[in-house]
Amino acid sequence: MVNPIATLLLECGAIEFGEFVLASGARSSYYIDIKAATTNPAVLTEIGKTIAEGREFEMVAGVAVGAVPIAVAVSLASGRPYAVVRKEGKDHGKAGTIIGDVLGKNVLLVEDVTTSGGSALYGLEALRAAGAHVDQVVTVVDREAGAREALAEKGASLLALVRVSELLDG
């Protein structure tokens, strides 16, 4: 396999082939356990470096909980601050949906796995509502099930470190 991130995901057990029943009840010939990658320091470090390289952004953000380790890894690799998009706002302490000052900043949104793009769209809208400029999303794995198109409709591009078709073809 040529894609070094795909190789790392396979080696750490984040991608398995076989017969699986997904949460939706659908059957799949592969399973993505991205937590096997994001809880592995060596793999997470490489993911962070790969995302940070050659991109222009002032801040990185991830939607809780899955994308937060990725946002931290990108922050450490780039030296730029990170923000967290909560799934639900809170009404005590520092209330709100966003942890971090994103107002007026060019924010790179990261995701662990994209399918239809629901989580990425939620993060995109929440960040924009908080005054951030967001036009790019980077995901570790894209299942190629509509996320790219959904984000494009909102004026954001999606870059995948690994596309499922690469894994199935390779």
Swiss-Prot record:
User: Which HAMAP family did the record assign?
Assistant: PyrE
Q: Where does 5-phospho-alpha-D-ribose 1-diphosphate bind?
A: 86-87, 90, 92, 111-119
GO molecular-function term, one example from the UniProt record: orotate phosphoribosyltransferase activity
- Annotated organism of origin: Methanoculleus marisnigri (strain ATCC 35101 / DSM 1498 / JR1)
What enzyme category does the UniProt record give? Answer: transferase
Keyword annotations = Glycosyltransferase, Magnesium, Pyrimidine biosynthesis, Transferase
- Superkingdom of the organism of origin: Archaea
List the pathway annotation. Answer: Pyrimidine metabolism; UMP biosynthesis via de novo pathway; UMP from orotate: step 1/2
> What role is this protein assigned?
Catalyzes the transfer of a ribosyl phosphate group from 5-phosphoribose 1-diphosphate to orotate, leading to the formation of orotidine monophosphate (OMP).
Q: Which NCBIfam families match?
A: pyrE
Membership in a protein family: Belongs to the purine/pyrimidine phosphoribosyltransferase family. PyrE subfamily.
Q: What is its EC number?
A: 2.4.2.10
Which Gene Ontology BP annotations are present? Answer: 'de novo' UMP biosynthetic process; pyrimidine nucleobase biosynthetic process
The cofactors it requires, by name, are: Mg(2+)
- What is this enzyme's catalytic activity, as reactions? orotidine 5'-phosphate + diphosphate = orotate + 5-phospho-alpha-D-ribose 1-diphosphate
Q: How does it assemble?
A: Homodimer.
Cite the InterPro entries for this sequence.
OPRT, Or_phspho_trans_dom, PRibTrfase_dom, PRTase-like
User: By what name is this protein known?
Assistant: Orotate phosphoribosyltransferase
- Positions of orotate binding: 115, 143
